[in-house]
């Protein structure tokens, strides 16, 4: 094979290979890193038991979004150290297989309905999102 035709063959083979790679395979970090979405809800009236029960009802509905792998709904623990924040009403932590699954959650009708139906209850929401390997060590 002549150098010129060999070079063209290799260029075309390289282009064919690139064209066959899916966009998801080209972004392995997005698919392999566990995504954690941690939200702290602060009620407008933190002493209102009805509002607290209503928000808990909404969080339990929200847990039904199918891309969520695991959910934890928590209240502040009875721990007292200077670095601990305990002024929130509920902690909502959910785990996703990857960022793509979390992006689906963000636009899912259950999530959008949750915001529409329950956002009047809170005065503030703080969100911490993180990614990392599924298992370390």
Language-model features: locations:
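C-terminal segment of N-terminal export signals and the immediately downstream linker at the start
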Residues: 24-50
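Short, well-ordered beta-strand segments in beta-rich or mixed alpha/beta enzyme
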Residues: 33-43, 74, 79-106
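Surface-exposed, polar helix/loop patches in the mature regions of secreted/periplasmic/lumenal proteins
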Residues: 94-133
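Short, solvent-exposed mixed-charge patches
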Residues: 136-137
């Amino acid at each position: 094979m002549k150098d010129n035709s060999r070079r063209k063959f290799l260029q075309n083979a390289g282009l064919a290979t690139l064209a066959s790679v899916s966009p998801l395979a080209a972004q392995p970090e997005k698919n392999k890193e566990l995504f954690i979405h941690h939200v702290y809800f602060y009620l407008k009236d933190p002493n209102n038991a009805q509002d607290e029960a209503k928000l808990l009802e909404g969080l339990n509905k929200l847990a039904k979004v199918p891309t969520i792998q695991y959910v934890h709904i928590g209240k502040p623990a009875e721990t007292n150290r200077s670095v601990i924040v305990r002024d929130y009403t509920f902690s909502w932590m959910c785990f996703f297989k990857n960022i793509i699954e979390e992006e689906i959650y963000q636009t899912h009708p259950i999530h959008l309905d949750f915001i529409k139906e329950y956002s009047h209850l809170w005065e503030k929401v703080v969100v911490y999102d993180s990614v990392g390997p599924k298992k370390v060590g």
